[in-house]
Swiss-Prot record:
The lineage of its organism: Bacteria, Pseudomonadati, Pseudomonadota, Gammaproteobacteria, Vibrionales. This is Thiosulfate sulfurtransferase GlpE. One of its GO terms (molecular function) is thiosulfate-cyanide sulfurtransferase activity. GO terms for biological process: glycerol metabolic process. The gene is glpE. It catalyses: thiosulfate + hydrogen cyanide = thiocyanate + sulfite + 2 H(+); thiosulfate + [thioredoxin]-dithiol = [thioredoxin]-disulfide + hydrogen sulfide + sulfite + 2 H(+).
């Protein structure tokens, strides 16, 4: 895949639930926002943690990228595609959409 795909918050949650997929959600919001609340088991992706992500997550694993509203995540998703990740999604609506949909959040 040369491009990332878009995914709704509900479909993102379903993909994360499918354990056989071993999908990973990365949250690119600022540290304070991440601490206040994030999707369960989300990986906080920053310039300082990108190497850790690439060491821990196989290129074949689905990666879902979340930001605040679903805009910044698109650039990050394309970056991950360019690094070799084969199945990358930008979560439409971002964390705000996830929260408004009443989906689970942890602190």
């Amino acid at each position: 895949m040369d491009q990332f795909q878009h995914i709704s918050v509900v479909d993102a949650q379903e993909k994360l639930k499918q354990q056989d997929l071993n999908a990973v959600l990365v949250d690119i919001r600022d540290p304070q926002s991440f601490i206040r609340g994030h999707v369960e088991n989300a990986f906080h992706l920053t310039n300082d943690t990108i190497v850790e992500l690439m060491n821990e997550v196989d290129f074949e694993q689905p990666v879902l990228v979340m930001c605040y509203h679903g805009h910044s995540s698109q650039g990050a998703a394309q970056y991950l595609v360019n690094q070799g990740y084969e199945e990358v999604y930008s979560v439409d609506g971002g964390f705000e959409g996830w929260h408004k949909a009443g989906l689970p959040v942890e602190k």
